[in-house]
Amino acid sequence: MHAQNDIPKAEILRGATIAFDLDGTLVDTAPDLVASLNLILAEEGLPPLPFDDVRKMVGRGAKALLERGFAAAGAPLDADQAPALVERFIALYLGRIAHESGPFPGVVDALVALRASGARLAVCTNKLTHLSVALLDALDLTQYFDAVVGADSAPAAKPDPRHLLATIAAVGGDPARAVMVGDSINDALAAKAANVPTLLVTFGYTEAPVETLGGDLLIDAFSDVPSACITLLTSCGRGNAGL
């Protein structure tokens, strides 16, 4: 179902934890990720990949993106060469991390509204933590988050629920009063296993139709995040219990 455009209610959001995926949810990172992948493919004498093909590969971390990218280019990564290529890719990407990337429309206003309502905000991403912080810093978004937990800072990466639970714990939150906002099957699976409701955006990088991923609520615009979180916290009996 799709969220209704309600007026955010501070008492429901106050003290709740809203955990966000990064790539394809908060920020449209595909342009710089695609460019970085195609640069390293060119260095290896391989043809570039179409933008839309690579866009669907984003969200599982740098190593997974390289593995899928090289396979799609017809040269599956050899286990011995993978570490050096991943390191090279990360260096290339860090050098252009926000050249063409930017927050999706409505992100800043929604984050401001959520913080004003007393919610605890965190980033739960399969991106490496230092890359995530560098991206958020470059886009002036770090100020809105109480914690940034990349795959390398968690016991295991999404879809393992421990990633989401560690993110909630990092802000002193309670899984019983939390929402996961994402765009992919990894977000949906991690949240389901952690018993946290999932809000999925329809404009992200998922390969499968977002309607098939098992999210509790879908939104077409980021401006609907505050009202959708209220809906989920209320319908799941997770509203502010007099805190």
Give the ranges of each region predicted by the language model.
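Alpha-helical substrate-recognition element adjacent to the catalytic core
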Residues: E43-A73, A79
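Asp-based, Mg2+/Mn2+-dependent phosphohydrolase catalytic module
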Residues: H2-I18, D52, V112-R115, T129, ...
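Conserved SAM-binding loop
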Residues: A19, L26, P103, L121-C124, ...
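Substrate-recognition element of Asp-dependent hydrolases with the DxDx(T/V) motif
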Residues: T25, L37, V107-D137
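Metal-dependent phosphoesterase signature
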Residues: A71-D109
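Active-site neighborhood of HAD-like aspartate-dependent phosphohydrolases
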Residues: I7-K56
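Hydrophobic alpha-helical core bundles mediating ligand binding, dimerization, or RNAP-core interactions
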Residues: L37, L41, V58, A62-L66, ...
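Residue-level detector of anion-binding/catalytic polar loops
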Residues: P47, R120, P197
